[in-house]
Amino acid sequence: MPDLLAHSVTPPAWRAWSRHLLDHITPTKAPILVGHSSASALVADLAIKLPAGGLIIVDGDIPPEQGRASPVRPALHDVIRNQADADGVLPVWSRWFLHDPQRAALIGLDRLAQDPVALARFEDGLPVMHIDWFDDSIELARWDHVPAGFIQASPIYDHATAEALRRGWPVARLGGTHLHPTLCPADTAQAILSLVHQLDAGSGRTQLTDASRKTGLDTDRR
């Protein structure tokens, strides 16, 4: 939400973020929450606090069933620590991977950069972060009883797709990039709605969604 993460504004502390978001969520009965990327841990936390009727993770790590959850994986933390300036301030997220073209392509930054106006608008909504912000963690209450689904937008999250299938979640594969929600919002919305229908129906079967079949993407090979 741009009003919460405006450029040059530090977001709430990681451990306080889900509580902060509660103030901006319109109360509704058993909502289904959607979290992209690192927000996967936030929706798991919110799913218990609300409580939620279900959650969908889009191209993010699947949080532990309970216990400590950090903003990023340790390997990424090491990468970004080296990019902090003398005061510990990081460049905006989209510039973390400027020297890694392969990673930038998996994220979709190369495609976004083809439109300088769109890139500038995108970066203007990104917060300026201090490296110490990423040292925080949240303690998740047990949430694995909440119905959940997973949308894989990029190959970055092959491991998360495998974990979702192991847990018996419905999974959609979009064959895009990490920024698929930004670059292809209609396609992403279709996949979300397809999973919502499955969660509403209470189907516990592990399967690929209609969104995956319609785009001719890979099938479940388990």
Regions found by a protein language model. Name each.
Residues P2, V58, I151:
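The conserved SAM/SAH-binding core of class I Rossmann-like methyltransferase domains
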Residues D3-I32, A69-D78:
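Active-site loop/oxyanion-hole signature of alpha/beta-hydrolase fold enzymes
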Residues L4-H7, G60, G176:
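Active-site loop/turn elements of alpha/beta-hydrolase fold enzymes
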Residues A30-Q66:
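Conserved hydrolase catalytic core segment
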Residues A52, I56-W93:
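Flexible "cap/lid" loop of the alpha/beta hydrolase fold
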Residues V92-R142:
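Conserved alpha/beta-hydrolase catalytic His-Asp/Glu region
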Residues L126-A186, L199:
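Conserved serine/cysteine hydrolase catalytic core
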Residues G176-R222:
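Catalytic active-site module of serine/aspartate enzymes centered on a nucleophile-bearing elbow/loop
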